[in-house]
From Swiss-Prot:
Name used for this protein in its record: Zinc finger CCCH domain-containing protein 49
PROSITE patterns (UniProt xref): RRM, ZF_C3H1
Biased composition annotated in UniProt, kind: Low complexity: 389-407, 415-430, 445-486
PANTHER family, alphabetized: PRE-MRNA-SPLICING FACTOR RBM22
Species of the source: Oryza sativa subsp. japonica
Length: 486
């Protein structure tokens, strides 16, 4: 290889690429993927030549994935560089070759020298624009491939591996462990080899798929010869009525196509029974339209309705089961007018009350003292505007006062500034507890101010004795007069 390096630096046989060749399942559902590119990091597991390795994480809960084979070996088999499944159908190489009756292993040598020469020759033809193998990716899919092909990505394949410490019961990471805490699957599928998958020899996954294809049942025509309708399930918004007509018209003349988008299904009715049988035989288990796999079955006739319920439902079909209360009252009273020709005949009694079921009895409502309008002083003024209660309210007030104890109206609350505070609805549906009934304050005797005594006549004042202060002031004077006289 040294002499080739001297002539051409690009002729060393090592792969140089800017992007991998992978399937949609391995790429992941995240549209923003960060890839690590390492030139000549690993050797191909098929041809053992160094190649550019790409490493990325398909999703949040997925493990890191990397390319396993070089692009030269990938193009020879038209497979993914990671999972080694067919890029077009998503099937193993053994299933694809068996279904298409081809053997792609004859053209690929097994020895090291011949394999290297074959890979270099293929690269030279690819750079020159020569298609080395025109069958890969261009063969028409047959019945087996249509039955087994995967029409949607399978992202479950990107899950993390099983934790080996958890299997032994020694994992101490718990929820922080990046691996799955599950028991590994045992059986034939647990023993897989990458070379057997690439060459299509002794692949356990391929053998399981081939056995599944042989066990798929076919559609058996029903015994009723009048059934000419086929049921198509699993419809998508991408499939239109014209697509169904183009797919089914090749097997016979179509009478009607009815699509039920709410149930994601459709019904195709043929004019003849032979056309329906031919379409069911040729499209069973392999109906794919615009990349959407559809389910095909024979239609079933609708179950006949009971005769006794037919008369009861006629009155509710016209009104949707919801009758006006006036009509209900007429039906209950028996005054509903009868149609002409039905006079004197008894009408069925089962058609009156279908949706008009009486309401259940209301639960007992808790009554609080604050809910009594008479106790809270809720009086309505009369229309005369004289500030007196109306006749009804007055009568009720008299009745309440005569029957029991009455309470005066409480004074209005006082707010600072003369404005009432704004009302805010309760937050979060919380309702405040009911207000306690108004309690009248204790009654005290009215306060009477002290008043001066009334004025008296002059004669009466002379007869009355002088106050104590005057007597005390006049005492010494009288005493001196007496002493002087003596």
């Amino acid at each position: 290889m040294a002499h080739r390096l001297l002539r051409d630096a690009q002729a060393d046989g090592w792969e140089r690429s800017d992007f991998p060749i992978i399937c949609e399942s391995c790429l992941g559902d995240n549209p923003y993927v960060r890839m690590l590119r390492a030139e000549y990091d690993k050797e191909c597991k098929i041809c053992a030549r160094p190649f550019t390795v790409f490493r990325w994480r398909p999703g949040r809960d997925a493990r890191y994935k990397k390319t396993e084979i070089c692009q030269t070996c990938c193009k020879l088999k038209n497979v993914c560089q990671v999972c080694l499944l067919d890029l077009e159908y998503g099937l193993p190489v053994q299933v694809r070759d068996t279904a298409l009756s081809t053997n792609s292993n004859d053209a690929i040598p097994r020895s090291d020298v011949n394999r290297e020469y074959f890979a270099e020759e293929h690269d030279r033809r690819a750079r020159a624009g020569i298609d080395y193998d025109s069958s890969n990716g261009k063969a028409r899919a047959n019945d087996t491939i249509l039955k087994l092909q995967r029409t949607a990505p399978y992202y479950k394949r990107n899950r993390a591996h099983v934790c080996s410490f958890y299997v032994r019961g020694e994992c101490t990471r718990g929820a922080e462990c990046p691996y799955r805490h599950e028991m590994p699957e045992t059986g034939e599928l647990s023993q897989q080899n990458i070379k057997d998958r690439y060459y299509g020899v002794n692949d356990p996954v391929a053998l399981k798929l081939l056995s599944k294809a042989g066990e798929m049942p076919s559609l058996t025509p029903p015994d009723d010869e009048s059934i000419r309708t086929l049921y198509i399930g699993g419809l998508d918004s991408r499939v239109t009525e014209q697509d169904l007509r183009d797919q089914f018209y090749a097997h016979g003349e179509i009478e009607t196509i009815r699509m039920v988008l709410q149930r994601a299904c459709a019904f195709v009715t043929y004019t003849t029974r032979e056309g329906a049988e031919k379409a069911a035989e040729e499209l069973a288990n392999k109906l794919v339209i615009k990349g959407v796999r559809l389910k095909l079955m024979w239609g079933k006739p609708q179950a006949p309705k009971p005769e006794e319920d037919e008369a009861g439902r006629q009155g509710h079909v016209a009104h949707g089961g919801m009758l006006p209360r006036a009509v209900i009252s007429q039906q209950q009273s028996g005054d509903q007018p009868q149609p002409p020709g039905m006079e004197g005949q008894q009408q069925p009694a089962s058609a009156s009350y279908y949706f008009n079921i009486p309401a259940p009895p209301a639960a007992e409502r808790t009554l609080y003292p604050s809910m009594d309008p008479q106790r809270m002083g809720a009086l309505v003024e009369s229309q005369e505007g004289d500030g007196k209660p109306g006749p009804q309210q007055a009568g009720q007030g008299q009745a309440s006062s005569s029957s029991g104890q009455s309470y005066p109206e409480p004074p209005p609350p006082y707010y600072h500034g003369g404005q009432y505070p704004p009302y805010y609805p309760p937050y979060g549906g919380y309702m405040p507890p009911p207000r306690m009934p108004y309690q009248q304050p204790p009654q005290y005797p009215a306060y009477q101010p002290m008043l001066a005594p009334p004025a008296q006549s002059q004669a009466s004042s002379l007869q009355q004795p002088a106050p104590a202060t005057q007597q005390l002031g006049q005492g010494p004077q009288q005493q001196t007069t007496q002493n002087g006289m003596t």
